[in-house]
Amino acid sequence: MIEFDNLTYLHGKPQGTGLLKANPEDFVVVEDLGFEPDGEGEHILVRILKNGCNTRFVADALAKFLKIHAREVSFAGQKDKHAVTEQWLCARVPGKEIPDLSAFQLEGCQVLEYARHKRKLRLGALKGNAFTLVLREVSNRDDVEQRLIDICVKGVPNYFGAQRFGIGGSNLQGALRWAQTNTPVRDRNKRSFWLSAARSALFNQIVAERLKKADVNQVVDGDALQLAGRGSWFVATTEELAELQRRVNDKELMITAALPGSGEWGTQREALAFEQAAVAAETELQALLVREKVEAARRAMLLYPQQLSWNWWDDVTVEIRFWLPAGSFATSVVRELINTTGDYAHIAE
């Protein structure tokens, strides 16, 4: 299995180094749910600003403040502890009265607004995230500048970030032990983290191999394509390749790679043979996903950061802003720009 740091680059390995997360204010994330609170209902949506706190810790503290069970507080996604982040929490508090959440106090956390909402906020129920990153001590400004220009046009590999695999790859190691021993895992969180890490690692491997051996944006017979921003997909046939290639070049369509699991992967013929060969050595992880009935799915191989802009504060410091859809990783953008240094460069929740 290829480790995250050794995955194939789209734009070649960066020539320079830079410091990421010199302080939390250098990594700002603003969650975009894509909708506003209803203003009524048995749930309360709470927008918080946090610095140095992980999401679960804040959710548990909010539950304690509201005197409800921790499972009654949900969120759309985990946010980096070593960053300044805005996100929404959702608490189930039936009744007409809205508690005074301005009295909620937690070091490193501030309530920005809150309102009633009809539905529970579920994991993954967000549109995306806006990022503002500051890279410091950049050793090669020209290389970073050119890479930013290239990313605007060609995007980056849509890899799952290192944080998906746990600190030191612990989640992936857990999945491998589980696959090898077949010992039942009853902890729901461990099961979820380990299965997610296994499937994500296989996806990354397929994308890395395709980057190594072919133009990742070249449609081949049997590829599974999806409309940009949509989840559904269809299979490319030989007769359609020229027209489909035009639509891919126009960023109307995206070529996908497998998220392996039980059931059909989605590709056919040449594309299916390539995907199967790319992960042929990982029989244990594939068997684990099938055994645990994790359904196979598809994910775009390339990621195009939206609203990408940057500003050089000086020759060694650059502020970069962009928006990514839910499920995408800022670290997968940064790794195409620079070799990062810093204690928390690869760490997230």
Swiss-Prot record:
Entry annotated with the keyword Isomerase: yes
Keywords for this protein: Isomerase, tRNA processing
Catalysed reaction equations from the record: uridine(13) in tRNA = pseudouridine(13) in tRNA
UniProt-annotated catalytic positions: D80
Classification via Pfam families: TruD (PF01142)
Positions with a binding annotation for substrate: F27, N129, F329
InterPro entries: PsdUridine_synth_cat_dom_sf (IPR020103), PsdUridine_synth_TruD (IPR001656), PsdUridine_synth_TruD_CS (IPR020119), PsdUridine_synth_TruD_insert (IPR011760), TruD_catalytic (IPR042214), TruD_insert_sf (IPR043165), TruD_pseudoU_synthase (IPR050170)
EC number: 5.4.99.27
Ranges for domain TRUD: 155-303
Biological processes per GO annotation: tRNA pseudouridine synthesis
Record has tRNA processing as a keyword: yes
Origin: domain of life: Bacteria
GO molecular function: RNA binding; tRNA pseudouridine(13) synthase activity
GO cellular component: cytosol
Biological function: Responsible for synthesis of pseudouridine from uracil-13 in transfer RNAs.
Family: Belongs to the pseudouridine synthase TruD family.
PANTHER family: TRNA PSEUDOURIDINE SYNTHASE D
Stated name of the protein: tRNA pseudouridine synthase D
Organism, scientific name: Escherichia coli O7:K1 (strain IAI39 / ExPEC)
